[in-house]
Amino acid sequence: MNQQTTLFSNEKLMAMIIPLFLEQLLIMLVGMADTLVVSYAGEAAVSGVSLVNQFNTIFIYLFTALASGGAVVISQYIGRKKNDDAGESASQLLSFSAIFSILIAVMVLIGNEGMLRLMFGKVEDSVMHSCITYLRISAYSYPALAVYNAGAALFRSIGKTSVTMYLSVISNIINVIGNFIGVFVLRAGVAGVAYPSLIARTFSAVMITVLCFQRKNEVFYRCKWIFRWNVDFMKQILKIAIPNGMENGVFQLVKVALSGIVALFGTYQIAANGVAQSIWSLAALAGVAMGPVFITVIGQCMGNGDADAAEHYFKILTRITLLISSAWNLLIFLLTPFFMKFYALQPETKRLVIWLVLIHNVFNAAAYPFSGALSNGLRAAGDVKFTMYVSVISTIAVRLLLSWLLGIVLKMGVIGIAIAMVCDWSIRAVIFFWRQKSGKWKTFQVI
C-alpha cells in the first residue's frame, strides 16, 4: 500500500458523504411536500403527475447512467493526474448529455399523446389531459436535467459534493415556492406543478454549468473541448454508461410489472405497500448517498494504478456504509409508528406497514451496502459487465419470479413481494462481496 491510501482522510471522506446524504434527504422531503401541494390541485392532477413520473423515471435513469459513466472516467483521469483529460472527458459528457437529452425531449414532445395512451389508455379523460399537460412541460426540462447531472458528475468526481448540495437547496426552494404559487395563487392545476420543476431544473443546469467553467476547480469545462468531438473519450464513458443504463432500464420495467402484481391484492395491502414505499425511500438514503463516494474514491485509486489503495478504501467505505445504514434504518423504523399518525389508515393496514418497513430496513442495513453501494465501486474499477449481468438476472429471476411465487401462488401478498426484494439484495450482496474479495475487478482498464 502506498501513499495513495492517505489521499482520502476521514475528514475528506466525511466532507463528501455528509453533503450527499443531506442532498438526498432534502430531495426526499421536498418530494413529500410536493405531493402534499399537488393533492390540492385535484385528484386528476395527482393521478396525472403520478403516472407521468413513472414514465419520466425511465429517462432520469438514462441520464443518471450517462453521468455515472462520466464520473468513473473523470475520477480515473484525476487519479492518474491527467486533469486536462479529466476536463475534456467532462466537457464531452456535457456535449453528449445535451444532444442526447434534446433528442429524447423532441421525441417525447412529438409522440407524447400516443405514448401515454399506449401506456395508460384506460384512464379517465381528465387524468389523461393532466398526463399530457404534465409530460409536455416535463419534456422541456430533460436537457436541463441531463446537463445538471453532467456538471454534478464533475463536482462529485473532484470531491466537492457541497456544491451540488447547495444548488439542490436553492433549486428545491424555487420548486416549492413555485408550486405554492402555481397551485394556490394562479390555480393552474397540473401546469402549476410542472412549470416550477422546469424553472428549478433550468436554474440548476445553468448555475452548475457556469461553476464548471471556473478554472480554480481541479477539473473544469473548456469551450474548445465541448465543441470538439472526441470519440475515444465518449467510448470510455459509454463503456460504463450503457451497461449501467441497461441494468437500470430492466429494473424500472420490473418495477412496473411488480406494480401490476400489487394491483391484484386487496385495497388495504395496496395502501400499505404505497405508504411503506414512501418510508422505504427515506430509509434507503444512506446507501444511495454512498454510491457516488465509492465511484470517486475507487475511481481515483484505480486511475492512479494503485489497486492496493482501492482495496483499502473498499474496506473503509463498506464499513462506513454499514455503520451509517444500520443507524439510519434503525432510526427510521423507530419513527415509523410516529409517521403512521399522519395517515388515515385502518389498524390492520398500519400493522402491515410496520412489518413491511421492518423487513426492508433490516436488509437495507445488512445487504444493500454490498448490493448497492459496493457495486458502484466495482463499476468505478471498470467491472461493469459483471455487475450488469448479475443485477439483471437477479432482478428478473429472483425479485420478479419470486414475487409472483410468494405473492400470488403462496398468497403472501405484499409481504411476499418484500421478501422477494430483500432476497434479490441478499443474493447480489453475496456475489458482489465475493467479486470484490476475488480481486478480479483489479484487471480491468477504463482509460
At which residue positions do the language-model features occur?
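Short alpha-helical transmembrane segments in multi-pass integral membrane proteins
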Residues: M1-L20, I74-S141, V183-I242, I298-N364, ...
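N-terminal transmembrane alpha-helices
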Residues: Q4-L36, Y40-A41, T57-G69, V73, ...
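Transmembrane helical elements of multi-pass membrane transporters/channels
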Residues: A15-D34, I137, Y148, S171, ...
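Hydrophobic residues within alpha-helical transmembrane segments
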Residues: I18, L22, V52-F55, S95, ...
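Helix-terminus/linker motif at the lipid-water interface of multi-pass membrane proteins
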Residues: L25, L29-S47, L116-D125, I181-A188, ...
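Interfacial/gating helices of multi-pass transporter permease domains
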Residues: V38-T57, S89, D125-S130, V190-A191, ...
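Small-residue-rich hydrophobic transmembrane alpha-helices
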Residues: V46-V106, L145-T164, S259, I270-T336, ...
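Short runs within selected transmembrane alpha-helices of multi-pass transporters and secretion channels
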Residues: A67, I137-R156, T164-N175, V193-I208, ...
